[in-house]
């Protein structure tokens, strides 16, 4: 499974990248706003930092302008993936850009119907939003499973990029079902290391080391 980091914070990306935990990055207008930086400037810095795909989202809602914005974003770096919303115009933009040989991430997916359309339009990635489905008392994992089944049935190459990740369980469940990629905030990825028994075991080891006067250096 590939790990993408869902942030525009350079230091957070760098920390995880140094550990080999970053296969790509996803951004959106809200994350860019939170960073307080120019979209082109911060996206370029992210692209210089990581080798994998960096999703940069268009801001337009009509296909023609989405395509123009996508081409502008593609000028930033070779590893840019253009991110478009799952609307009819977004699918038109996806088809045009992928036909030109570019990578496209179709975002804001909430149904397998939508995911099927995105795959037919040539999407590189489909981003189903797990957490937002959970917010309205639907099981986001059911959607991941439905998309996986449909894509496997017909051999679609579109990768399932599980998004709106809120918890470690979201990551693990996505992995169990067979999502190709997860994108999560740095804090959620880092929290995967935590377990109370690990802490308890380490405390016991440290107590024994102190009692025995063990030193390595």
UniProtKB/Swiss-Prot annotation:
The active site is at residue 83. GO terms for molecular function: aldehyde-lyase activity; transaldolase activity. The keyword Protein biosynthesis does not apply. It is an enzyme of class 2 (transferase). Pfam families: TAL_FSA. GO terms for cellular component: cytoplasm. Its EC number is 2.2.1.2. One of its GO terms (biological process) is pentose-phosphate shunt. InterPro entries: Aldolase_TIM, TAL/FSA, Transaldolase_3B, Transaldolase_3B/F6P_aldolase, Transaldolase_AS, TSA/FSA_arc/bac. Pathway: Carbohydrate degradation; pentose phosphate pathway; D-glyceraldehyde 3-phosphate and beta-D-fructose 6-phosphate from D-ribose 5-phosphate and D-xylulose 5-phosphate (non-oxidative stage): step 2/3. SUPFAM superfamilies: Aldolase. It is found in: Cytoplasm. Keywords: Cytoplasm, Pentose shunt, Schiff base, Transferase. It catalyses: D-sedoheptulose 7-phosphate + D-glyceraldehyde 3-phosphate = D-erythrose 4-phosphate + beta-D-fructose 6-phosphate. Belongs to the transaldolase family. Type 3B subfamily. HAMAP family: Transaldolase_3b. Transaldolase is important for the balance of metabolites in the pentose-phosphate pathway. This is Probable transaldolase. It comes from Ruegeria sp. (strain TM1040). The lineage of its organism: Bacteria, Pseudomonadati, Pseudomonadota, Alphaproteobacteria, Rhodobacterales.
């Amino acid at each position: 499974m590939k790990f993408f980091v869902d942030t525009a914070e350079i230091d957070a990306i760098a920390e995880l990248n140094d550990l080999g935990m970053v296969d790509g990055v996803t951004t959106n207008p809200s994350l860019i706003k939170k960073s307080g930086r120019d979209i082109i400037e911060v996206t370029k810095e992210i692209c210089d930092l990581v080798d994998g795909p960096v999703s940069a989202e268009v801001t337009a809602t009509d296909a023609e302008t989405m395509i123009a914005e996508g081409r502008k974003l593609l000028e930033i770096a070779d590893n840019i993936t253009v991110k478009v919303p799952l609307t009819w115009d977004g699918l038109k933009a996806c088809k045009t850009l992928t036909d030109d040989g570019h990578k496209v991430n179709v975002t804001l997916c909430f149904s397998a119907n939508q995911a099927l359309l995105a795959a037919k339009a040539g999407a590189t990635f489909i981003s189903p939003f797990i957490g937002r489905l959970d917010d309205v008392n639907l099981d986001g994992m059911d959607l991941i499973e439905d998309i996986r089944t449909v894509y496997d049935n017909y051999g679609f190459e579109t990768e399932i990029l599980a998004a709106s990740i809120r918890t470690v369980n979201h990551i693990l469940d996505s992995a169990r079902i067979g999502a190709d990629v997860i994108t999560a905030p740095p804090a959620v990825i880092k929290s995967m290391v935590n377990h109370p028994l690990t802490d308890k075991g380490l405390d016991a080891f440290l107590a024994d080391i102190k009692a025995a006067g063990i030193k390595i250096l």
